[in-house]
């Protein structure tokens, strides 16, 4: 049987060096192959992973070792799952949509209030008050790239804050080359997300230092494959963060990840298991609507109702996130736009599965995932009447549930766009400050996550010594429990109102000063 590259992920308390020595030895016992196994990638930036050349049988056996979390094909090489961005053009969602050069990210205004000050209105003209601007903090957008010369990313002197570093040189990884077009965003998604976090008009951290990491698979259709592979991307960030020295030694790092993995199909399922009970499609449930109402397997909604996209997890990517957080990096992740419930480990829906040829645990959310990161669900730009009070509610597309931990505005969010941009996805307008650049309003949990990432930069400016755990505890404690909630955790067909059991906590900041910004929500 031929060998192929596998990622071996060990548990957090396992001595990886000692484990690897066993795998590389000429002889092995137990689940360790009885031969000297060749290293495919030593992963010098990881404390939990090494890539080995194994046969399928050896990989299956090694996965049974009590020290191992998982043995799987590297995410870049998998064909049973796909990487994607968590945003869609606003007009898809049948809400008030469009573009206007006077509009500003309404999340800035909403998250400085303890309750919904918009009521049921779509427009609010007032002041966004702020005292902090992210000075002294390093922000990374891991996405489709960034337009480095966009005016949104300039400092007060008109100089770009985007640091166009070579990630391999900065991390010390040898044998890899960063493409000359790495700092061109051919899509627009990454530029938009960065604008929400650190834009000087649309963003929270208006003076944070900006870094961009274009991720392979997210580059956009016009991009000539200039991104960094998943495997290298996480190592680059960890090692670069650990290598900070001199005046930069104590600068905190915040990473926004508005992307995730999913499984797409145009077929009907054959069977599955819901809360421990097996079912067969066509017998127990004869329509997709009945199946969704009973089990939460989403009906076909995407691409003119022909494609179902389910969230999927990848142990390799999730372990990468844990390693980043352990290194002191603050990680923010978009929950996804798959309409799905994201159950917490051990919850009633965590082991639900559906068979579409392969078996998918569809209520675990999508990778990247970590309960120690900020898993961000999206608030809508419309509200829900609750006994005469207009309450914030979930965006219809948003994945949400006990496996997520905070809500932030994600529908109809105005921010920067790049040139060139993805014409098949976006319809930007001229940037209000310079007609040679673009801005646009789009929706997604992709837009909710960078609201959180931007606010983290403000907290870290105030106290750069905060660990990821300390700051997460503070952010969650400060959040306001005001999202409309049906009170039911399995009303899966109520996708426009139900939180699916997620805490109703909205991102909130108490920072304020006399500095004012006129703002309009549309």
Label for each model-derived stretch:
Residues 32-41, 64-137, 151-152, 502-504, ...:
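Protease zymogen maturation seam
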Residues 216-370, 433-450:
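Substrate-binding/access-modulating region of protease and related hydrolase catalytic domains
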Residues 143, 329, 355-461:
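Extracellular S/T/G-rich loop segment that most often corresponds to the catalytic His/Ser-adjacent loop
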Residues 10-12, 73-76, 141-145, 196-200, ...:
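Active-site-proximal beta-strand/loop segments in catalytic clefts of secreted hydrolases
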Residues 1, 194-197, 211-218, 253, ...:
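Hydrolase catalytic cores
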Residues 1-85:
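Inhibitory N-terminal propeptides of secreted protease zymogens
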Residues 22, 26, 65, 74, ...:
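Structured segments of extracytoplasmic/periplasmic soluble domains
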Residues 99-104, 124-232, 245-254, 263-269, ...:
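Subtilisin-like serine protease catalytic core
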């Amino acid at each position: 049987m031929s060998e192929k590259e596998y990622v071996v992920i060990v548990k957090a308390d396992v001595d990886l060096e000692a484990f690897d020595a066993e795998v590389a030895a000429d002889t092995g016992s137990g689940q360790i192959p009885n031969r000297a196994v060749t290293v495919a990638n030593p992963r010098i930036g990881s404390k939990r992973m090494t890539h080995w050349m194994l046969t399928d049988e050896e990989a299956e056996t090694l996965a049974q070792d009590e020290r191992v979390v998982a043995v799987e094909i590297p995410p870049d090489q998998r064909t049973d799952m796909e990487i994607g961005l968590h945003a869609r053009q606003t007009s898809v969602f049948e809400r008030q949509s469009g573009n206007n050069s006077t509009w500003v990210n309404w999340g800035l205004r909403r998250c400085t209030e303890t309750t919904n000050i918009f009521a049921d209105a779509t427009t609010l003209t007032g002041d966004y008050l702020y005292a902090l601007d992210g000075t002294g903090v390093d922000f990374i957008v891991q996405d489709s790239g960034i337009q480095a010369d966009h005016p949104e990313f300039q400092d007060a002197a008109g100089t770009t804050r985007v640091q166009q570093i070579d990630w391999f040189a900065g991390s010390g990884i040898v044998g890899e080359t960063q493409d000359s077009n790495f700092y061109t965003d051919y899509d627009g998604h990454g530029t938009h997300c960065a604008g929400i976090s650190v834009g000087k008009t649309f963003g929270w951290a208006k003076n944070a230092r900006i870094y961009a990491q274009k991720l392979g698979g997210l580059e956009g259709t016009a991009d000539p494959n200039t991104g960094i592979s998943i495997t290298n991307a996480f190592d680059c960030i960890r090692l670069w963060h650990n290598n900070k020295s001199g005046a930069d030694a104590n600068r905190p790092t915040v990473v926004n990840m508005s992307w995730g993995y999913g499984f797409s199909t145009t077929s009907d399922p054959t069977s599955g298991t819901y809360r421990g009970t097996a079912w067969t499609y066509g017998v127990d449930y004869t329509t997709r609507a009945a199946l969704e109402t009973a089990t939460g397997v989403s009906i076909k909604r995407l691409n003119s109702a022909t494609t179902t996209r389910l969230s999927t997890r990848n142990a390799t990517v999730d372990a990468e996130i844990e390693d980043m957080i352990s290194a002191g990096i603050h990680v923010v992740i978009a929950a996804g736009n798959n309409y799905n419930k994201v159950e917490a480990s051990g919850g009633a829906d965590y082991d639900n599965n559906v068979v579409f040829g392969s078996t998918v645990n569809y209520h675990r959310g999508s990778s990247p995932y970590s309960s120690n990161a900020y898993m961000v669900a999206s608030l809508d730009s419309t509200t829900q009447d609750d006994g005469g009070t207009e309450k914030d509610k979930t965006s219809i597309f948003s994945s949400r549930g006990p496996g997520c931990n905070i809500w932030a505005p994600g529908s109809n969010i105005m921010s920067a766009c790049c040139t060139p941009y993805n014409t098949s996805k976006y319809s930007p307008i001229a940037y209000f400050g310079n007609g040679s650049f673009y801005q646009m309003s789009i929706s997604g949990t992709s837009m909710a996550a960078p609201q959180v990432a931007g606010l983290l930069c403000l907290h870290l400016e105030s106290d750069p010594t905060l660990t990821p755990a300390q700051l997460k505890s503070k952010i969650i404690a400060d959040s306001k429990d005001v999202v409309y909630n049906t009170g039911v955790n399995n009303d899966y067909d109520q996708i426009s109102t139900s939180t699916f059991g997620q805490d109703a906590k909205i991102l909130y900041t108490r920072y304020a000063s006399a500095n004012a910004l006129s703002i309009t929500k549309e």
